[in-house]
């Protein structure tokens, strides 16, 4: 174990390393890809994690202190390959780019984070199965109700609903099987078995700060994005909890993607009672979309029925099977 970023005296660091530490402080829950020339470099604990997960050589870098900072790096032209491997393991990655040409800059090159890639927000088609949605879900627990928002930023899907008990909530989670789930602190204390959920679904789960779930902020965020004066214009008049979940999710997407998310043009409320309630054990035993043993599509009901010709059709077929109408 090398020197820890938590124990460094920032004032003793080199200017570049001071900027690195400052940037890392803003993205504590992410691995920071820090662009230096033709490489993305990782330092301190990030370097140790990445070197272990990706089997890369761990070296050191002079940082202005008596002890060298742990370091590992990857070529920027091959970054997507390494990035995809980290995302598949459930990590979040903040990409800090050079915003100036080092050859034409005197002093420190200006750098800033241009995007944050997470399991539910990756846009790399090579890392995704185009026949299934890559969902990110937001859940908020307020006044004994659960507000749910689901989005797939690769296809523009954005849906919301509300449920009033844990059983129905778990059905929604298992039904959509999101790659990532964000929630409020109250959700983690609602009686849900968080660790079991993460392990069974291989899901990335994180609790966001409470300000994400501020009622007024969430409502205002949705109204501004969809250009409506009231939530009634979105069909969300009676979806108070879902509005909070959707607003928090949208803010999270804005922060990670660093763009306006204009391709999310519609938000669709739905009622869970219109669909068959299927618990996780039943889904598994019926082998709706994958077999029990091999976890493969071949041999499942989806494999038998799926004669679709396009990726969009394949996603729709999967949706019909996972969420059958009553």
Regions found by a protein language model. Give the residues of each.
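Charged catalytic and DNA/RNA-contacting regions of genome-maintenance
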Residues: 1-326
């Amino acid at each position: 174990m090398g020197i820890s970023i938590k124990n460094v005296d920032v004032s003793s660091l080199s200017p570049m390393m001071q900027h690195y530490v400052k940037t890392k402080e803003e993205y504590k829950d992410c691995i920071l890809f820090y662009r230096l020339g033709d490489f993305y470099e990782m330092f301190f604990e990030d370097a140790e994690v990445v070197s272990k997960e990706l089997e890369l050589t761990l070296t050191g870098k002079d940082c202005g202190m008596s002890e060298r900072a742990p370091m590992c790096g990857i070529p920027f032209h091959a970054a997507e390959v390494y990035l995809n491997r980290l995302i598949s393991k459930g990590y979040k990655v903040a990409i800090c780019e050079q915003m100036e040409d080092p050859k034409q800059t005197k002093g420190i090159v200006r750098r800033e984070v241009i995007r944050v890639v997470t399991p539910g927000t990756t846009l790399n088609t090579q890392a995704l199965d185009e026949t299934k949605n890559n969902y990110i879900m937001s859940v908020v627990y307020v006044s004994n109700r659960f507000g749910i928002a689901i989005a797939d930023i690769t296809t523009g899907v954005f849906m919301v609903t509300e449920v009033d008990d844990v059983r129905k909530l778990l059905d929604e989670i298992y039904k959509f099987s999101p790659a990532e789930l964000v929630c409020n602190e109250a959700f983690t204390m609602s009686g849900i078995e968080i660790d079991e959920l993460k392990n069974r679904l291989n899901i990335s789960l994180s609790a966001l700060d409470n300000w994400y779930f501020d009622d007024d902020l969430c409502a205002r965020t949705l109204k501004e994005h969809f250009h409506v004066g009231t939530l009634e214009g979105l069909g969300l008049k009676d979806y108070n909890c879902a509005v909070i979940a959707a607003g928090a999710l949208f803010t999270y997407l804005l922060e990670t993607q660093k763009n306006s998310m204009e391709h999310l043009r519609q938000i669709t409320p739905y009622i869970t009672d219109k669909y068959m309630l299927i618990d996780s054990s039943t889904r598994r035993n019926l082998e709706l979309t994958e077999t029990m043993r091999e976890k493969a599509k071949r041999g499942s009901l989806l494999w038998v029925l799926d004669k679709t010709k396009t990726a969009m059709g394949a996603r729709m077929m999967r949706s019909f099977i996972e969420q059958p109408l009553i």
